[in-house]
Curated annotation (Swiss-Prot):
Name of this chain's protein: Nucleotide-binding protein Exig_2405
Organism listed in the record: Exiguobacterium sibiricum (strain DSM 17290 / CCUG 55495 / CIP 109462 / JCM 13490 / 255-15)
Keyword set, alphabetical order: ATP-binding, GTP-binding, Nucleotide-binding
Family: Belongs to the RapZ-like family.
MF annotations from Gene Ontology: ATP binding; GTP binding
Binding residue positions for ATP: G13, M14, S15, G16, A17, G18, K19, T20
């Protein structure tokens, strides 16, 4: 990327998922930030501001819901220019968003006199098209504002950002599906080390557990098929312009089988891609005996 190539980051997503933190983070990175700009004014903003401030961040949400249809027309036109565009979509689980609204004592903009959950569900429907087109999806359900800021700074800092990252995540279904996952694989069909007394307190990071999980013929066969599938799929996602691919591997609690497979897949692809391994429910796993 040329140093002076104009850049536009579109920040969107669920109300309460962290757009204010995101906008503050982009200001710290030297972006010219505009909140709630009608999409039809984007070309004029870029033309006027882009001459002196080549990095622009714009937050668009359901406050501009009357302009959502026009946004996608403008977005497709801008993609045909020399402008480098990335769309960041911020999301969080419904229960987390409801809690945040109650803590802030604010009503949801789409349900000012009703339950926040009603507004959240309406908003998800309205923003579905944005989520599908976003190059980067961040689930803020289980992270604090400072951690979100650090993640944004790392992702968008020039010279440090990795063009394409494969995020391999283990998780437990009983703790909820990861909202930012692109691919989800269910490992609950494999024999569960939880029922082996000496393995129960351990995790997939322990050799005894990983050896137990991978010893079964069905585990070996599934692993081979999974590697073959990812070898095909990862380049397809990269070609689509995504900045990352989140591969989520789940078992019941996120403690044994999912961690074993996440570690194995990470090692399998570490020499081909920039790999980030995230054991989402590891803290829960260590607490469970």
């Amino acid at each position: 990327m040329e140093q002076n190539q104009p850049q536009l980051v579109i920040i969107t997503g669920m109300s309460g998922a962290g757009k204010t933190v995101a906008m503050n983070s982009f200001e710290d990175l030297g972006y010219f930030c505009v909140d709630n700009l009608p999409p039809t004014l984007l070309p004029q903003l870029i033309e006027v501001i882009g001459q002196v401030r080549p990095k622009i961040a714009v937050a668009i949400d359901t406050r501009a819901r009357d302009f959502i249809d026009s946004f996608f027309v403008v977005y497709e036109d801008l993609k045909k220019t020399n402008l480098q565009i990335r769309m960041l979509y911020l999301d969080a689980r419904n229960d987390v968003l409801v809690r945040r609204y109650k803590e802030s004592r604010r009503s949801h903009p789409l349900a000012p006199t009703a339950s926040p959950l009603i507004g959240i569900e309406r908003e998800r429907t309205l923003l579905e098209g944005f989520r599908d087109k976003a190059q980067l999806l961040m689930d803020t359900s289980d992270i604090k504002p400072l951690a979100l800021k650090e993640r944004i700074l790392k992702e968008f800092t020039e010279g440090e950002r990795i063009p394409f990252t494969v995020n391999v995540m283990s998780f437990g279904f009983k703790h909820g599906l990861p909202l930012d996952a692109d691919l989800v694989f269910d490992l609950r069909f494999l024999p569960n080390p939880f029922y082996i007394p000496e393995l129960r307190p351990k995790t997939g990071l322990d050799l005894e557990v990983s050896s137990y999980v991978m010893q079964w013929p069905e585990a070996k066969l599934f692993y081979k098929k999974l590697v073959d599938m990812l070898e095909f799929l990862i380049p397809q996602y990269e070609r689509e312009g995504k900045s990352q691919l989140v591969v989520a591997l789940g078992c019941t609690g996120g403690k044994h089988r999912s961690i074993t497979f996440a570690e194995a897949i990470s090692k399998e692809f570490k020499n081909q891609y920039h790999i980030v391994t995230n054991h989402r429910d590891y803290v829960h796993a260590k607490e469970e005996k």
